[in-house]
Amino acid sequence: MTTIDRYIIKKFLSTFFFAVLIFTMVAMVIDFSERIDDFLEEDVPIREIIWKYYLNFIPQINAMLWPLFTLISVIFFTSRMAQNSEILSILNSGASFRRIMRPYLIASSMLAFIHLMGNHFIIPIGNQIKVAFENKYVSKIDLDSKNDHIHLFLDDHTKVYIKYNSKSDSIAHGFGIEGFNDDGELIDETVADLARWQTETQSWRMENVKIRHFDGLEETFKRFPRLDTVINLQPKDLVRRDNYKTTMTTPNLIQFINEERKKGVGAFTSFRVEVHRRSSEPFTIIILTCIGMAIASRKTRGGMGIHLAIGAVIGALFIVLGRFSSTLSTNAGLHPFLGAWLPNIVFIFVVIYLVRNAQQ
Protein backbone atom coordinates (compact mmCIF):
# COMPACT_ATOMS: atom_id res chain seq x y z
CA MET A 1 0.00 0.00 0.00
CA THR A 2 1.48 3.33 -1.10
CA THR A 3 1.37 6.70 0.61
CA ILE A 4 -1.33 7.84 -1.82
CA ASP A 5 -3.43 4.78 -0.95
CA ARG A 6 -3.21 5.55 2.75
CA TYR A 7 -3.97 9.21 2.07
CA ILE A 8 -7.15 8.40 0.11
CA ILE A 9 -8.32 5.76 2.62
CA LYS A 10 -7.80 8.21 5.47
CA LYS A 11 -9.74 10.91 3.61
CA PHE A 12 -12.50 8.43 2.77
CA LEU A 13 -13.02 7.05 6.27
CA SER A 14 -12.65 10.37 8.09
CA THR A 15 -15.19 12.07 5.82
CA PHE A 16 -17.56 9.11 6.07
CA PHE A 17 -17.54 8.84 9.85
CA PHE A 18 -17.83 12.62 10.22
CA ALA A 19 -20.99 12.50 8.08
CA VAL A 20 -22.27 9.60 10.19
CA LEU A 21 -21.58 11.54 13.40
CA ILE A 22 -23.42 14.65 12.21
CA PHE A 23 -26.41 12.64 10.99
CA THR A 24 -26.55 10.62 14.21
CA MET A 25 -26.68 13.76 16.33
CA VAL A 26 -29.44 15.28 14.19
CA ALA A 27 -31.44 12.02 14.12
CA MET A 28 -31.23 11.63 17.90
CA VAL A 29 -32.39 15.21 18.50
CA ILE A 30 -35.36 14.79 16.15
CA ASP A 31 -36.32 11.40 17.59
CA PHE A 32 -35.99 12.60 21.18
CA SER A 33 -38.17 15.63 20.47
CA GLU A 34 -40.86 13.31 19.09
CA ARG A 35 -40.73 10.85 21.98
CA ILE A 36 -40.07 13.08 24.97
CA ASP A 37 -43.77 13.25 25.85
CA ASP A 38 -43.96 9.44 25.97
CA PHE A 39 -40.81 9.26 28.08
CA LEU A 40 -42.12 11.82 30.57
CA GLU A 41 -45.60 10.31 30.69
CA GLU A 42 -44.23 6.86 31.50
CA ASP A 43 -41.48 8.23 33.77
CA VAL A 44 -38.86 6.23 31.89
CA PRO A 45 -35.48 6.08 33.68
CA ILE A 46 -32.72 8.00 31.91
CA ARG A 47 -30.48 4.94 32.07
CA GLU A 48 -32.97 2.86 30.09
CA ILE A 49 -33.48 5.62 27.52
CA ILE A 50 -29.75 5.77 26.88
CA TRP A 51 -28.69 2.13 27.16
CA LYS A 52 -31.78 0.27 25.97
CA TYR A 53 -33.15 2.66 23.39
CA TYR A 54 -30.62 5.07 21.91
CA LEU A 55 -27.66 2.71 22.12
CA ASN A 56 -29.59 0.42 19.77
CA PHE A 57 -31.33 3.21 17.85
CA ILE A 58 -28.02 4.57 16.56
CA PRO A 59 -26.85 1.42 14.68
CA GLN A 60 -30.30 0.83 13.21
CA ILE A 61 -30.83 4.34 11.85
CA ASN A 62 -27.27 4.55 10.53
CA ALA A 63 -27.35 1.18 8.80
CA MET A 64 -30.31 2.34 6.72
CA LEU A 65 -28.25 5.17 5.20
CA TRP A 66 -24.67 3.90 5.16
CA PRO A 67 -24.72 3.45 1.35
CA LEU A 68 -25.88 7.05 0.86
CA PHE A 69 -23.34 8.32 3.39
CA THR A 70 -20.70 6.52 1.37
CA LEU A 71 -21.81 8.12 -1.90
CA ILE A 72 -21.92 11.63 -0.42
CA SER A 73 -18.59 11.22 1.38
CA VAL A 74 -16.79 9.92 -1.71
CA ILE A 75 -18.16 12.72 -3.88
CA PHE A 76 -17.30 15.33 -1.24
CA PHE A 77 -13.63 14.55 -0.71
CA THR A 78 -12.92 13.33 -4.26
CA SER A 79 -14.41 16.48 -5.72
CA ARG A 80 -12.14 18.57 -3.50
CA MET A 81 -9.16 16.51 -4.64
CA ALA A 82 -10.19 17.04 -8.27
CA GLN A 83 -10.59 20.80 -7.81
CA ASN A 84 -7.13 20.92 -6.22
CA SER A 85 -5.77 18.99 -9.24
CA GLU A 86 -4.69 16.11 -6.99
CA ILE A 87 -6.45 13.48 -9.13
CA LEU A 88 -4.90 14.94 -12.27
CA SER A 89 -1.44 14.89 -10.67
CA ILE A 90 -1.81 11.23 -9.73
CA LEU A 91 -2.86 10.39 -13.30
CA ASN A 92 0.06 12.37 -14.73
CA SER A 93 2.44 10.39 -12.53
CA GLY A 94 1.57 7.29 -14.55
CA ALA A 95 -1.15 5.75 -12.38
CA SER A 96 -4.23 4.54 -14.21
CA PHE A 97 -7.76 5.39 -13.19
CA ARG A 98 -8.35 1.81 -12.10
CA ARG A 99 -5.23 1.97 -9.94
CA ILE A 100 -6.58 5.08 -8.23
CA MET A 101 -9.78 3.16 -7.50
CA ARG A 102 -7.89 0.58 -5.42
CA PRO A 103 -7.89 2.52 -2.11
CA TYR A 104 -11.54 3.40 -2.67
CA LEU A 105 -12.37 -0.28 -3.04
CA ILE A 106 -10.31 -1.19 0.03
CA ALA A 107 -12.06 1.39 2.21
CA SER A 108 -15.53 0.60 0.87
CA SER A 109 -14.93 -3.14 1.36
CA MET A 110 -14.04 -2.49 4.99
CA LEU A 111 -17.28 -0.56 5.48
CA ALA A 112 -19.23 -3.21 3.56
CA PHE A 113 -17.91 -5.97 5.83
CA ILE A 114 -18.87 -4.01 8.97
CA HIS A 115 -22.30 -3.35 7.48
CA LEU A 116 -22.70 -7.03 6.54
CA MET A 117 -21.97 -8.24 10.08
CA GLY A 118 -24.21 -5.54 11.51
CA ASN A 119 -27.14 -6.39 9.25
CA HIS A 120 -27.01 -10.12 9.89
CA PHE A 121 -26.18 -10.23 13.60
CA ILE A 122 -25.44 -7.05 15.57
CA ILE A 123 -28.40 -4.83 14.62
CA PRO A 124 -31.08 -7.56 15.04
CA ILE A 125 -29.80 -8.32 18.55
CA GLY A 126 -29.92 -4.62 19.41
CA ASN A 127 -33.39 -4.33 17.91
CA GLN A 128 -34.65 -7.00 20.29
CA ILE A 129 -33.81 -4.71 23.21
CA LYS A 130 -35.08 -1.60 21.42
CA VAL A 131 -38.42 -3.16 20.41
CA ALA A 132 -38.97 -4.51 23.92
CA PHE A 133 -38.37 -0.98 25.24
CA GLU A 134 -40.82 0.51 22.73
CA ASN A 135 -43.48 -2.06 23.58
CA LYS A 136 -43.10 -1.33 27.27
CA TYR A 137 -43.01 2.45 27.24
CA VAL A 138 -44.00 3.83 23.83
CA SER A 139 -46.31 1.78 21.64
CA LYS A 140 -47.36 -0.70 24.33
CA ILE A 141 -48.23 -3.36 21.84
CA ASP A 142 -47.09 -6.92 21.67
CA LEU A 143 -46.96 -9.06 18.60
CA ASP A 144 -49.62 -8.42 15.97
CA SER A 145 -52.08 -11.27 15.80
CA LYS A 146 -53.38 -13.09 12.76
CA ASN A 147 -57.07 -12.73 13.50
CA ASP A 148 -59.24 -13.96 10.66
CA HIS A 149 -59.37 -17.14 8.59
CA ILE A 150 -56.10 -18.77 9.57
CA HIS A 151 -54.97 -21.90 7.70
CA LEU A 152 -51.87 -23.77 8.86
CA PHE A 153 -50.34 -27.12 7.89
CA LEU A 154 -48.79 -28.65 11.01
CA ASP A 155 -47.33 -31.51 8.96
CA ASP A 156 -47.99 -33.35 5.71
CA HIS A 157 -51.13 -34.96 7.12
CA THR A 158 -52.63 -32.35 9.45
CA LYS A 159 -54.17 -28.97 8.73
CA VAL A 160 -55.63 -26.53 11.24
CA TYR A 161 -58.02 -23.73 10.41
CA ILE A 162 -59.37 -21.02 12.69
CA LYS A 163 -62.17 -18.66 11.80
CA TYR A 164 -61.20 -16.02 14.36
CA ASN A 165 -58.39 -15.87 16.89
CA SER A 166 -58.66 -13.83 20.09
CA LYS A 167 -55.11 -13.13 21.23
CA SER A 168 -56.06 -11.47 24.50
CA ASP A 169 -57.54 -14.66 26.02
CA SER A 170 -55.94 -17.33 23.76
CA ILE A 171 -59.26 -18.52 22.37
CA ALA A 172 -59.60 -19.77 18.80
CA HIS A 173 -63.16 -19.52 17.46
CA GLY A 174 -64.34 -21.77 14.66
CA PHE A 175 -61.53 -24.22 15.38
CA GLY A 176 -61.00 -27.15 13.02
CA ILE A 177 -58.50 -29.95 12.39
CA GLU A 178 -58.35 -31.88 9.12
CA GLY A 179 -56.45 -35.14 8.66
CA PHE A 180 -55.20 -36.40 5.28
CA ASN A 181 -53.75 -39.69 4.09
CA ASP A 182 -50.62 -40.08 1.96
CA ASP A 183 -52.68 -39.49 -1.20
CA GLY A 184 -53.91 -36.15 0.10
CA GLU A 185 -57.46 -37.40 0.67
CA LEU A 186 -59.45 -36.11 3.64
CA ILE A 187 -59.93 -38.94 6.17
CA ASP A 188 -61.17 -37.10 9.26
CA GLU A 189 -62.38 -33.68 10.30
CA THR A 190 -62.73 -32.24 13.79
CA VAL A 191 -64.76 -29.07 14.23
CA ALA A 192 -65.31 -27.12 17.45
CA ASP A 193 -67.10 -23.89 18.26
CA LEU A 194 -63.97 -22.75 20.04
CA ALA A 195 -60.69 -24.01 21.46
CA ARG A 196 -59.13 -22.54 24.58
CA TRP A 197 -55.38 -22.83 25.22
CA GLN A 198 -54.52 -24.64 28.47
CA THR A 199 -51.18 -23.40 29.76
CA GLU A 200 -50.89 -26.11 32.42
CA THR A 201 -51.23 -29.04 30.03
CA GLN A 202 -49.96 -27.27 26.89
CA SER A 203 -53.05 -28.40 25.00
CA TRP A 204 -56.19 -27.02 23.37
CA ARG A 205 -59.54 -27.63 25.08
CA MET A 206 -62.24 -27.75 22.43
CA GLU A 207 -65.92 -27.12 23.18
CA ASN A 208 -68.98 -28.46 21.33
CA VAL A 209 -66.85 -30.83 19.27
CA LYS A 210 -67.97 -32.71 16.15
CA ILE A 211 -65.74 -35.41 14.65
CA ARG A 212 -66.31 -36.94 11.23
CA HIS A 213 -64.28 -39.89 9.96
CA PHE A 214 -64.29 -40.93 6.30
CA ASP A 215 -63.54 -44.46 5.12
CA GLY A 216 -64.26 -44.64 1.44
CA LEU A 217 -67.97 -44.02 1.06
CA GLU A 218 -68.63 -44.67 4.73
CA GLU A 219 -68.76 -41.86 7.25
CA THR A 220 -68.89 -41.99 11.05
CA PHE A 221 -69.91 -39.10 13.25
CA LYS A 222 -69.20 -38.36 16.93
CA ARG A 223 -70.04 -35.44 19.17
CA PHE A 224 -68.42 -34.33 22.44
CA PRO A 225 -69.30 -31.39 24.70
CA ARG A 226 -65.62 -30.95 25.53
CA LEU A 227 -62.42 -32.56 24.31
CA ASP A 228 -58.72 -31.86 24.84
CA THR A 229 -56.28 -32.27 21.98
CA VAL A 230 -52.50 -32.05 21.85
CA ILE A 231 -51.22 -30.73 18.52
CA ASN A 232 -48.06 -28.97 17.43
CA LEU A 233 -49.63 -25.53 17.68
CA GLN A 234 -49.33 -22.85 20.35
CA PRO A 235 -50.78 -19.32 20.61
CA LYS A 236 -47.37 -17.89 19.72
CA ASP A 237 -47.68 -19.61 16.33
CA LEU A 238 -50.76 -17.51 15.61
CA VAL A 239 -48.65 -14.38 15.54
CA ARG A 240 -47.64 -12.31 12.55
CA ARG A 241 -44.05 -11.21 12.96
CA ASP A 242 -43.90 -8.73 10.10
CA ASN A 243 -42.84 -5.94 12.45
CA TYR A 244 -40.38 -8.24 14.20
CA LYS A 245 -38.30 -9.46 11.30
CA THR A 246 -35.72 -6.81 12.19
CA THR A 247 -35.28 -8.41 15.63
CA MET A 248 -34.24 -11.81 14.28
CA THR A 249 -30.68 -12.60 13.32
CA THR A 250 -30.37 -14.08 9.86
CA PRO A 251 -30.04 -17.73 11.06
CA ASN A 252 -33.19 -17.27 13.17
CA LEU A 253 -34.95 -15.56 10.28
CA ILE A 254 -34.13 -18.42 7.91
CA GLN A 255 -35.34 -20.93 10.51
CA PHE A 256 -38.59 -18.98 10.89
CA ILE A 257 -39.10 -18.93 7.11
CA ASN A 258 -38.62 -22.70 6.93
CA GLU A 259 -41.09 -23.24 9.77
CA GLU A 260 -43.68 -21.04 8.08
CA ARG A 261 -43.16 -22.85 4.79
CA LYS A 262 -43.79 -26.21 6.47
CA LYS A 263 -47.03 -24.85 7.93
CA GLY A 264 -48.17 -23.82 4.48
CA VAL A 265 -48.13 -20.14 5.32
CA GLY A 266 -47.56 -18.14 2.16
CA ALA A 267 -47.18 -14.65 3.61
CA PHE A 268 -43.46 -14.77 4.33
CA THR A 269 -42.11 -13.23 1.13
CA SER A 270 -41.19 -10.02 2.95
CA PHE A 271 -39.03 -12.10 5.30
CA ARG A 272 -37.19 -13.66 2.37
CA VAL A 273 -36.64 -10.19 0.90
CA GLU A 274 -35.26 -9.10 4.27
CA VAL A 275 -32.70 -11.93 4.24
CA HIS A 276 -31.43 -10.93 0.80
CA ARG A 277 -31.54 -7.21 1.66
CA ARG A 278 -29.11 -7.74 4.53
CA SER A 279 -26.53 -8.99 2.04
CA SER A 280 -27.30 -6.64 -0.84
CA GLU A 281 -26.99 -3.37 1.11
CA PRO A 282 -23.29 -3.87 1.97
CA PHE A 283 -22.58 -4.55 -1.69
CA THR A 284 -24.38 -1.30 -2.48
CA ILE A 285 -21.67 0.54 -0.56
CA ILE A 286 -19.04 -0.69 -3.01
CA ILE A 287 -21.18 0.14 -6.06
CA LEU A 288 -21.98 3.68 -4.91
CA THR A 289 -18.32 4.22 -4.02
CA CYS A 290 -17.32 3.46 -7.61
CA ILE A 291 -20.08 5.70 -8.97
CA GLY A 292 -19.18 8.58 -6.68
CA MET A 293 -15.48 8.30 -7.46
CA ALA A 294 -16.07 8.20 -11.23
CA ILE A 295 -18.34 11.25 -11.10
CA ALA A 296 -16.28 13.43 -8.77
CA SER A 297 -12.80 12.66 -10.12
CA ARG A 298 -13.28 14.91 -13.14
CA LYS A 299 -12.64 18.61 -12.57
CA THR A 300 -15.66 20.64 -13.70
CA ARG A 301 -16.65 24.28 -13.79
CA GLY A 302 -19.55 23.65 -11.40
CA GLY A 303 -17.18 22.12 -8.87
CA MET A 304 -18.42 20.18 -5.88
CA GLY A 305 -21.95 21.54 -6.22
CA ILE A 306 -22.66 19.84 -9.53
CA HIS A 307 -21.06 16.63 -8.29
CA LEU A 308 -23.22 16.56 -5.16
CA ALA A 309 -26.32 17.31 -7.23
CA ILE A 310 -25.60 14.36 -9.52
CA GLY A 311 -24.94 12.20 -6.47
CA ALA A 312 -28.26 13.24 -4.91
CA VAL A 313 -30.11 12.26 -8.10
CA ILE A 314 -28.35 8.89 -8.24
CA GLY A 315 -29.09 8.25 -4.56
CA ALA A 316 -32.76 9.12 -5.05
CA LEU A 317 -33.02 6.84 -8.09
CA PHE A 318 -31.37 4.03 -6.15
CA ILE A 319 -33.83 4.38 -3.26
CA VAL A 320 -36.86 4.56 -5.58
CA LEU A 321 -35.74 1.50 -7.53
CA GLY A 322 -35.09 -0.37 -4.28
CA ARG A 323 -38.56 0.40 -2.91
CA PHE A 324 -40.14 -0.46 -6.26
CA SER A 325 -38.40 -3.83 -6.55
CA SER A 326 -39.19 -4.72 -2.91
CA THR A 327 -42.87 -3.93 -3.49
CA LEU A 328 -42.90 -6.03 -6.65
CA SER A 329 -41.34 -8.91 -4.76
CA THR A 330 -43.77 -8.70 -1.84
CA ASN A 331 -46.97 -8.08 -3.79
CA ALA A 332 -46.43 -9.00 -7.44
CA GLY A 333 -44.49 -12.26 -7.38
CA LEU A 334 -41.00 -11.01 -8.20
CA HIS A 335 -38.40 -13.39 -6.77
CA PRO A 336 -37.14 -12.16 -3.34
CA PHE A 337 -33.54 -12.27 -4.57
CA LEU A 338 -34.34 -9.86 -7.39
CA GLY A 339 -36.44 -7.77 -5.03
CA ALA A 340 -33.35 -7.09 -2.95
CA TRP A 341 -30.61 -7.17 -5.59
CA LEU A 342 -32.25 -5.51 -8.61
CA PRO A 343 -30.93 -1.98 -7.82
CA ASN A 344 -27.39 -3.35 -7.50
CA ILE A 345 -27.73 -5.29 -10.74
CA VAL A 346 -28.95 -2.20 -12.60
CA PHE A 347 -26.38 0.19 -11.16
CA ILE A 348 -23.44 -2.13 -11.69
CA PHE A 349 -23.90 -1.41 -15.41
CA VAL A 350 -23.80 2.29 -14.54
CA VAL A 351 -20.47 1.64 -12.81
CA ILE A 352 -19.09 -0.12 -15.88
CA TYR A 353 -20.13 2.77 -18.13
CA LEU A 354 -18.74 5.48 -15.84
CA VAL A 355 -15.42 3.72 -15.29
CA ARG A 356 -14.93 3.12 -19.02
CA ASN A 357 -15.60 6.79 -19.76
CA ALA A 358 -13.78 8.22 -16.75
CA GLN A 359 -10.87 10.62 -16.97
CA GLN A 360 -7.72 8.66 -17.82
Model-found features: residue ranges?
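Transmembrane alpha-helices
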Residues: M1-D156, K167, E185, D215-E219, ...
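Extended beta-sheet lipid-handling architectures
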Residues: I8, A172, T190-A192, W204-I211
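Extended lipid/amphipathic-ligand handling interfaces
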Residues: I162-Y164, A192-Q198
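Membrane-interface helix/helix-cap signal primarily in integral membrane proteins
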Residues: L194, I211-T229
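Short, solvent-exposed aromatic-acidic interface loops
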Residues: E178-D182, N208-G216
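Extracytoplasmic/periplasmic/luminal assembly and interaction segments
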Residues: K163-D183
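Soluble periplasmic/extracytoplasmic beta-strand elements of cell-envelope proteins
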Residues: H151-L152, K159-Y161, G176, R205
